[in-house]
């Protein structure tokens, strides 16, 4: 038996299983934290993964619904657990995801109580040679946010992408991505604008790049980002460079973060691709 992928939504998993049945390939679903899709005949793995890639591009394609009707199992009999809102938040994120999220919220509250400047004096990228050995500064800039929209946007993506990485690959991988991308995106942004910047967006862009490329090159990892969302992130990135929104955007951090995530995903999947 070979696990092909996992879906957070059991109905989506059932749609893919039904479609593959019409193609003569039998898959089974095992319900754990997510809906795990398993293949008994491992010789068919290549074909299944190719079909999975097409399915993930457009799960709403009518052919998949038609397959469910053809199989006579649009009502599959699965029981779907209903999660309250906060239980859903907990379910889809691990301890490191939550730790960073709560730190960002705490820092944002302090910024609103004390003002940005006192907080930046303690957390900003080293702005004086005497501060270069205060190691936390190379990462703590990511905890600061300067508007409600800024923090909501970043934390939503952090929870969605960081939670997926931590749940499917492990806390260690998320820690490594976060530390490296915060350091490199901060360094690049410092070269562009000096030390007075902040936000988790460099890390978020790293996660976008990592999750997308890891999912493309290693579908069995269980993480993926729809191509439409990675396209949206690129459009947002380009718009930031041309100041379309009229806001101060850390473009250097965004580009460096995205490049870091792509590079890490490439390295992490290189061995498996060579072996294949």
Curated annotation (Swiss-Prot):
NCBIfam families: PRK10907.1, rhombo_GlpG. The keyword Membrane applies. It comes from Klebsiella pneumoniae (strain 342). It is an enzyme of class 3 (hydrolase). The keyword Cell inner membrane applies. Belongs to the peptidase S54 family. The lineage of its organism: Bacteria, Pseudomonadati, Pseudomonadota, Gammaproteobacteria, Enterobacterales. Keywords: Cell inner membrane, Cell membrane, Hydrolase, Membrane, Protease, Serine protease, Transmembrane, Transmembrane helix. The chain crosses the membrane at residues 94-114, 142-162, 169-189, 192-212, 229-249, 252-272. One of its GO terms (cellular component) is plasma membrane. It is found in: Cell inner membrane. This is Rhomboid protease GlpG. The active site is at residues 201, 254. The gene is glpG.
